[in-house]
UniProtKB/Swiss-Prot annotation:
Gene3D superfamilies: 1.10.1390.10, Glucose-6-phosphate isomerase like protein, domain 1. Pfam families: PGI (PF00342). Its main location: cytoplasm. Keywords: Cytoplasm, Gluconeogenesis, Glycolysis, Isomerase. Residues 537-549 have a biased composition (Basic and acidic residues). Belongs to the GPI family. This is Glucose-6-phosphate isomerase. HAMAP family: G6P_isomerase (MF_00473). It catalyses: alpha-D-glucose 6-phosphate = beta-D-fructose 6-phosphate. InterPro entries: G6P_Isomerase, G6P_Isomerase_C, Phosphoglucose_isomerase_CS, SIS_dom_sf, SIS_PGI_1, SIS_PGI_2. GO terms for biological process: gluconeogenesis; glucose 6-phosphate metabolic process; glycolytic process. It is an enzyme of class 5 (isomerase).
């Protein structure tokens, strides 16, 4: 049987503390401690992380750390970094942290020199992208490649597309990237629009080279290329990120242009592996190395810092605090940077696929709520969409605000005297302030507001936020941000006793889709389905496609 964390004395002490502090108000917490904004903050690498606007006291944090220790967080953290098989349902090591180890590090797992393997692939990626960026690699007609189209899904898409947008200012070799993931043909058609086959390179990202959506899109892309340039062009315009040399070769890709990765890398943790090939093609191997160094900086902090001063630990524990003791089900991620527009979508997979589990690692039911629903949009777009609910709604939604002191782009304000970036960041600081402290009925009445309107204008405040401030959005900072959330996921998963590194919940739907495809397409009318809803939907679909229902 797995450990029931809720039965421990540490958890029960935390539950009593929750009852004692009740709805402790942030106004009062700041009034009681003039230095709270400085004391409840930590600087790690390029990230200044302010967690003072949370409903926590020093005692809360101490009790949360006690729970983490009761769950064996430090031991399990060390087990992950050393390559033990902590993914128990698949009997695998979990070594995404090895992807960013420096060349002189040492790590042997299951008899294999992991660091040497990682850097062999990174070197091959670097050599290939150097040729691509310099124009040494030419397409079938002798023209330079100007567009890389990454075809993948899930972790083979969400990471690269997010990082590509985040680091668009570091594109410096005349190469741009597009990303195709959805098996809806509209995705591929839109991404191929306006492209010249002679200057386009496809990266097919599939570990097994058998992922249905990816191979369907890859085959359609191959057909598009062959129609323009002929069969022999495939080897000059397709490369693979895969471990299945046989299927890669059968597709027409030279296996010398196949870049591998390992079973100990989960898809949602793989953007810093060969899955990042499209990113490296755009920003270059040196910037990609900076990206990896950012991950490693946070890895080392997480591995070595005391739990009480460990940023991923503290943020993971605070997330658990709201999830399990306040009934909060979601967390908003609100980057005040349009270049991080895809960050919330990336975190959705990272967090929800990892911790969306209802059984513990040993198969027994969990004893408390697990997983956070991540969502969000860049500021200030979100302010004009859903912040109303954050400020005055009945649901508690903790939020992470991410901002930068230096802009990647800046323009003057309407009157020509100010900076649009300053305007953006004034909203960042104002929103966290208003969410925390609100505005009372007395304060609103004192402004001469009509009594009938006062209740509608009251801002209750006491809405929790984390503020993450960095100097600038650089490759290193992007790596730091990703690793910060990766390790939060681990912290919460350990305390809940779940396996954060499998994803069995996505498998049954894939199997069922394969079974249903011929039901949709066969010439003969289908047999009755196992439920009346699916049966009616299938028959309506067939009828509207002109097939016998």
């Amino acid at each position: 049987m797995g450990t029931d964390i809720t039965a421990t004395s540490e958890w029960q002490a935390l539950a009593r503390h929750r009852d004692e502090i009740g709805e402790t108000n942030l106004r009062q917490l700041f009034a009681d401690d003039a230095a709270r904004g400085l004391r409840f903050a930590v600087t790690v690498g390029g990230l200044y992380i302010d967690y003072s606007k949370h409903r926590v006291t020093a005692e809360t944090l101490n009790l949360l750390v006690d729970v983490a220790r009761a769950a064996g967080l430090e031991t399990k953290r060390d087990a992950m970094f050393s390559g033990e098989h902590i993914n128990t349902s698949e009997d695998r090591a979990v070594l995404h942290t090895a992807l960013r180890l420096p060349r002189d590090a040492a790590l042997t797992v299951d008899g294999q020199d992991v660091v040497a393997d990682v850097h062999e692939v990174l070197d091959r990626m670097g050599d290939f992208t150097d040729r691509l960026r310099s124009g040494d690699w030419l397409g079938a007609t002798g023209e330079r490649i100007t567009t890389v189209v990454n075809i993948g899904i899930g972790g083979s898409d969400l990471g690269p597309v997010m990082v590509d947008q985040a680091l668009r200012h570091y594109a410096d070799a005349g190469i741009s990237a597009r990303f195709v993931s959805n098996v809806d043909p509209a995705d591929l058609v839109a991404k191929l629009a306006g492209l010249n086959p002679a200057t386009t390179l496809f990266v097919i990202a599939s570990k097994t080279f058998s992922t249905l959506e990816t191979l369907t899109n890859a085959t359609a892309a191959r057909r598009w290329l062959i129609e323009a340039l002929g069969e022999d062009a495939v080897s000059k315009h397709f490369v693979a990120v895969s471990t299945n040399a046989k299927l890669v070769a059968e597709f027409g890709i030279d296996t010398d242009n196949m870049f591998g990765f390992w079973d100990w890398v989960g898809g949602r943790y793989s953007v810093d592996s060969a899955i990042g090939l499209s990113v490296m093609a755009v920003i270059g191997r040196e910037r990609f190395a900076e990206f990896l160094a950012g991950f490693h900086l946070i890895d080392e902090h997480f591995r070595t810092a005391p739990l009480e001063a460990n940023a991923p630990v503290l943020l993971g524990l605070i997330g658990l605090w709201y999830n399990n003791f306040f009934g909060a089900e979601t967390r908003a991620v609100l980057p005040y940077s349009n270049d991080l527009a895809r960050f919330a979508a990336y975190l959705q997979q990272l967090t929800m696929e990892s911790n969306g589990k209802s059984v513990q690692a040993d198969g027994t039911p969990v004893s408390t709520a697990t997983g956070e629903i991540f969502w969000g949009e860049p500021g200030t777009n979100g302010q004009h969409a859903f912040y109303q609910l954050l400020h005055q709604g009945t649901r508690l939604v903790p939020a992470d605000f991410i901002g930068f002191s230096e802009p990647t782009d800046d323009l003057p304000t309407a009157d020509g005297t100010g900076s649009m970036h300053d305007l953006l960041m004034s909203n960042f600081f104002a929103q966290t302030q208003v969410l925390a402290f609100g505005k009372t009925a007395d304060e609103i009445s004192a402004e001469g507001t009509s009594p009938d309107v006062v209740p509608h204008k009251v801002m209750p405040g006491n809405r929790p936020t984390t503020s993450i401030l960095a100097t600038k959005l650089t490759p290193s900072v992007v790596g730091q941000l990703i690793a910060l959330y990766e390790h939060q996921v681990f912290v919460e998963g350990v305390i809940w006793g779940i396996d954060s590194f499998d994803q069995w919940g996505v498998e049954l739907g894939k199997t069922q889709a394969k079974a249903l495809l011929p039901v949709l397409t066969d010439a003969e009318p289908p047999a009755a389905q196992s439920d009346s809803s699916t049966d009616a939907l299938v028959r309506r679909y067939r009828s509207e496609r002109g097939r016998t229902a």
